[in-house]
UniProtKB/Swiss-Prot annotation:
Record's catalysed reaction(s): [protein]-dithiol + NAD(+) = [protein]-disulfide + NADH + H(+); [protein]-dithiol + NADP(+) = [protein]-disulfide + NADPH + H(+)
The encoding gene: dsbD
The organism of origin for this protein: Yersinia enterocolitica serotype O:8 / biotype 1B (strain NCTC 13174 / 8081)
Protein name as annotated: Thiol:disulfide interchange protein DsbD
PANTHER family: THIOL:DISULFIDE INTERCHANGE PROTEIN DSBD
UniProt xrefs under InterPro entries: Cyt_c_assmbl_TM_dom, DsbD_gamma, DsbDN, DsbDN_sf, Thiol_diS_interchange_DbsD, Thioredoxin-like_sf, Thioredoxin_CS, Thioredoxin_domain
Family as reported in the entry's similarity comment: Belongs to the thioredoxin family. DsbD subfamily.
Function: Required to facilitate the formation of correct disulfide bonds in some periplasmic proteins and for the assembly of the periplasmic c-type cytochromes. Acts by transferring electrons from cytoplasmic thioredoxin to the periplasm. This transfer involves a cascade of disulfide bond formation and reduction steps.
Residues making up the signal peptide according to the UniProt record: 1-24
Annotated S-S bridges: C134-C140, C195-C317, C493-C496
Enzyme Commission identifier(s): 1.8.1.8
Amino acid sequence: MAQRFITLILLLCSILLAPHSAQASLFGDNSSFGQKSSQSRFIPVDQAFAFDFRQQGDQLALSWQIHPDYYLYRQQIKIVPNNATFGAFTLPEGIAHRDEFYGEVAIFKQQLTLKIPITQAGERASVSVTYQGCAEAGFCYPPETRVVPLSAITAGSSAVTAPPIAAPATPAPAELPFSPLWALLIGIGIAFTPCVLPMYPLISAIILGREKPHSQRRILLLAIVYVQGMALTYTLLGLVVAAAGLQFQAALQHPYVLIGLSALFVLLALSMFGLYSLQLPSSLQTRLVQWSSSQRGGSLAGVFAMGALAGLICSPCTTAPLSAILLYIAQSGNMLAGGGTLYLYALGMGIPLVIVTLFGNKLLPRSGPWMQYVKEAFGFVILALPVFLLERVLGDVWGLRLWSLLAIAFFGWAFILSLKAHSGWARAFQLLLLAALLIAARPLQDWAFGSPTQQSEIKHLAFKQVADLPQLQAALAQAKGKPVMLDLYADWCVACKEFEKYTFSDEQVQRQLADTVLLQADVTANSAEHAALLKELNVLGLPTILFFDAPGNEIPAARVTGFMNASGFLQHLQNLPR
């Protein structure tokens, strides 16, 4: 009996002195679950992206030490001066990175240093620095904004040496969605419009002048010099417009401005379809033609001057495409791409002219209705530009629908034109156009009539939205004794979109959450209310999912940070304390 009593005492002591994890395994799963889930895998934003700054005279240095396995988005870095003026600066190119939902983006890893020349800084001047990044494990931080105080600098006391490529106070000029080489093809295509092609024999004769016959080498040289003069005018136009857009790049990214530019592009495209004509005032055109005619044909200087003036004489066929390209370059704010794009555009228009000057009219195709069709085709090219701009405002879903609408219009137009031909190959081409038309219409069909995929998405995304802490507290009070799940979401959070696409769409996850009140806080705007909500809930970043019991108290052990696939999330739900 005494031996049993001693054994019982020793067993009790071993339990009391055992490690906490052993006790958890004895007293149930809840403690073990809580210990595992409450430990965040992710570090605070100040440790993930250690930000520092230093001002030495008229030079401001901004630096970030980036923790391993974390990265900053290049496009999310914004520099906004207050009561100060900066010289030209640019961000490094960054590392190419592909996001499933955002496509190709540039990121920074390990370290980033940015040096900014200060041309002027008044009393109490400062600069707002905004940046945002993520962890490779599937966790994103809200945009961080730091205010850096600046020492006063007068405009005359600083000598600034600008980098070779200029950038605005909001750095990183936007990349053009097209390769500049497309401008070369567009220029060649414009050469075959009804306002341009018939003029080439006349221009060729003016270039050669009335002197004695030239050698083939001399003819080629004169034609190239004329094209280079025209290209110089276009290149200068591109640089001037890009520089102007550079000063207002932040304003040009505003949704209302993007919508206005899109409407302007549509109006330019309509002129290509013959609704109206766009060109320089006749008085100005007459004066430019007189200046051009006064130049001496056959001489290199005179031919170059004629080419430069010809770049300013816009015909109805070239005004709309040139205006569209200039507007888009201004919106991008990229001077290098702006000048290069316009140079290639002029070069494309000049290639057929060089051929005509060198070999004569025999290589030119016959004029006919097909030239008007070429002009109309470029109307569709111009219509692609507003779709690119509106995608930034409306999002990917509506962007896809706009592309679908544009493709339907183009293939329908091409099909109607093909009906005028009666050969065998034309029938095959018509079938291809009909097939393309049906494929292009698919996004609009899914939108109009719905699809099983869309219906399932609507089902699992049936969250009740809460915008701030009072709304959350009210929603918890109205839960009527049911458990509550709060999903913290933002558009800039890639892993949040992965949760939506891969985890919340799972049928087993949906069944497990059938008796749970689903709340969602969309903190995309990162407003003061959103920041207060995240601070109150002690949230480092997104995705973060919180669970509340029936009385409305959070279950700290159940919190989820970072992406979790459907099977892992389902197991997490099944292990929730009841």
